[in-house]
Amino acid sequence: MAAEISISASSRAICLQRNPFPAPKYFATAPPLLFFSPLTCNLDAILRSRRKPRLAACFVLKDDKLYTAQSGKQSDTEAIGDEIEVETNEEKSLAVRLAEKFARKKSERFTYLVAAVMSSLGITSMAVISVYYRFSWQMEGGEMPFSEMFCTFALAFGAAIGMEYWARWAHRALWHASLWHMHESHHRPREGPFELNDIFAIINAVPAIALLSFGFNHKGLIPGLCFGAGLGITVFGMAYMFVHDGLVHKRFPVGPIANVPYFQRVAAAHQLHHSDKFDGVPYGLFLGPKELEEVGVLEELEKEVNRRIKSSKRL
């Protein structure tokens, strides 16, 4: 607490308990009559005429605590105003970034959807036309090659099943090992509609195209088996794209496929693969729930299924 002194002068007489100019004691009684004594006559007048200027001292107390509190409140108000302004600017910039991200994701999904639909329609059309013309060409002799047709479709079904086991082995032994530098892009946030991991789809398409081409241009049981194998690889690739890329990673909408219960379990199992909870298991796709059952973690699978269902309902 600080003290300030204010001093002012006045011409008024001040009364103190003790007169600074006391009168002689003999004034208390009647003064003696002295002739020709001017001091006796004029002493009272002199005392009455003398005036002492009053000195007033005013002490002004300054409360440092109160001053500090008021200054603190003012600074707090200014700080709160600055914080509100900063938060408002941050919210605006965040909203702009979210809008840009949403627009970019929407564009990426549309781009991949167009590519997926065009490739699927093209491959499906080519497969159907190839099957039709191959068997119609072989029937020109008048005999229906039932045995060859049966072997072709049987191997097509077997090739589709076998591709699941091939994908499981390749995923574990190659993609998460020597080819991790390519597959790693699939385990990171994607930037753009495509990723380096998509090259594996092209690599798997090469033998399918070769087998289909050889089986289409040649007659006989062996060419028929090759044609069936290429057809099975093609069907598996299309199913893998819609379930893995569309349903699991939501690179494009898949429609009613998302409501199929078994496909929901497949998607949840593959999501557990990306969580690395069980050393990467499952490495397969369509038989992923079976792999989790083998390691005894079906409870975690059910939790993930329920989580995905709740998340889809919120959307």
Curated annotation (Swiss-Prot):
It comes from the Eukaryota. It is found in: Plastid, Chloroplast membrane. Changing H176A: Loss of activity. Residues 1-58 form a transit peptide. Changing H274A: Loss of activity. Residues 159-286 form the Fatty acid hydroxylase domain. Changing H186A: Loss of activity. It catalyses: all-trans-beta-carotene + 4 reduced [2Fe-2S]-[ferredoxin] + 2 O2 + 4 H(+) = all-trans-zeaxanthin + 4 oxidized [2Fe-2S]-[ferredoxin] + 2 H2O; all-trans-beta-carotene + 2 reduced [2Fe-2S]-[ferredoxin] + O2 + 2 H(+) = beta-cryptoxanthin + 2 oxidized [2Fe-2S]-[ferredoxin] + H2O; beta-cryptoxanthin + 2 reduced [2Fe-2S]-[ferredoxin] + O2 + 2 H(+) = all-trans-zeaxanthin + 2 oxidized [2Fe-2S]-[ferredoxin] + H2O. Nonheme diiron monooxygenase involved in the biosynthesis of xanthophylls. Specific for beta-ring hydroxylations of beta-carotene. Produces beta-cryptoxanthin and zeaxanthin. Uses ferredoxin as an electron donor. This is Beta-carotene hydroxylase 1, chloroplastic. It comes from Capsicum annuum (Capsicum pepper). The lineage of its organism: Eukaryota, Viridiplantae, Streptophyta, Embryophyta, Tracheophyta. The gene is CA1.
